Amino acid sequence: MTRRITTLLGLAIASLTVATAAQAELRVKCEVRSDRSTASVDGKSVPNGNYYAVLTSGANSATSTAQPTIQREVEIDFSSRPRDINKGATPLAADFIVGGQATGALYTEAGALVATKTVACRVR
């Protein structure tokens, strides 16, 4: 009986994770200049809770702190600009973005992957 309940609970959790990932929309934007890198990873239509993002470009990787949703949306910023960092952006090196592209991944606070997306960065 206990094994059956455990199995059913595991299936329910797996189904919830798949449903969360299927419904979520992920927008990743990035910009690179000679003296700075900036990016944002934004989740829309995600269940209320806390989420963190991982931004990668080439061999570089940065992980944000967990941020709460506001009306089922979460916006996570990354930047090498001191002004943006002072406003809460996750710090990046000025040369963080390489090869003109970056990948953003959104995770639940518990570490479940919600969505991932690779984009070409705006080069200025």
Regions found by a protein language model. Give the residues of each.
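Bacterial N-terminal signal peptides
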Residues: 9-17
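Edge beta-strands of extracellular beta-sandwich domains
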Residues: 88-93, 111-124
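Solvent-exposed serine/threonine-rich low-complexity stretches and specific carbohydrate-binding patches
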Residues: 60-81, 118-122
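Short, surface-exposed binding/anchoring microloops in extracellular/periplasmic proteins
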Residues: 25-68
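N-terminal signal peptide c-region/cleavage motif recognized by signal peptidases
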Residues: 19-21
